């Protein structure tokens, strides 16, 4: 186990180091932001209109053609909001200081352009299965767009491991540990219950997935927002000082913390961007799709980035 931990730590330090994922993903986000002329700003109002115009608990159901705009947003938010948005932010704050929160916000802004580009490609290269359902994603546009099937296969293997094993393990472990510490519930029992509930949703297909998420996500979002507003209201006097620490810590972490935690600007950027990208999944191509004009669905998809962006 110690050897496995050491291996994971080494790989993590390399992947999230100075010359790999952080500059690559931020660079891609900056490129798409400039190339698309700040699409996340120009089309934000239109994305809200298209998405929440279909907000209904008894609206259109998912079928062969996929999901409604709100169902797509709900499914994307359900996948993106989780441990990374709560524990990840706390970890970034601890490891990178208050300034890490500023870089989380920057990662969220750039990520909206990245996920817009992802969704455009997914819309352009999606196909209809023999069963009639529409499917798409990075594996399809890598294979058909780049004409590189080996890379598409490699991506598919990686995304299965990331979403099917690693991501689910982190979320389920956090839930099980929380119930165990708070109520003394056995972790194995919590895991079994989660597996059964998830299986019932998963094997129900796209229609059941969309139906469940469009009902649960508004409740989840409301609890998340109300909880955040309550904390802000009860600590109103700390809001301005907190913002000052965040902005100052983004460029001079030692001055913001008095040198207590001993972080540098490089570490603030590294932990802020890493936790921001982990929380929102930009660059993974995990956004749901439907057969509509690519740019319209993409605006809805980019909105999920903003709605699931970690708060401080």
Each PLM stretch: what is its role?
Residues 1-78, 83, 93-100, 111:
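N-terminal alpha-helical transmembrane segments of multi-pass membrane transport
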Residues 22-27, 67-74, 148-162, 192-193, ...:
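Select transmembrane alpha-helical segments in multipass membrane proteins
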Residues 24-28, 35-48, 174-179, 186-247:
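Membrane-interface loop-to-helix entry segments
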Residues 32-33, 107-132, 138-173, 177-202:
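Helix-loop-helix module between adjacent transmembrane segments
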Residues 57-95, 121-139, 143, 157-160, ...:
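Alpha-helical membrane segments and immediately flanking helix-loop junctions
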Residues 118, 309-312:
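Short alpha-helical transmembrane segments in multi-pass integral membrane proteins
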Residues 138, 175, 201-218, 238-243, ...:
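Hydrophobic, small-residue-rich membrane helices and short re-entrant helix-turn-helix hairpins
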Residues 214, 219-287, 306-307:
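Membrane-embedded translocation segments of transport machinery
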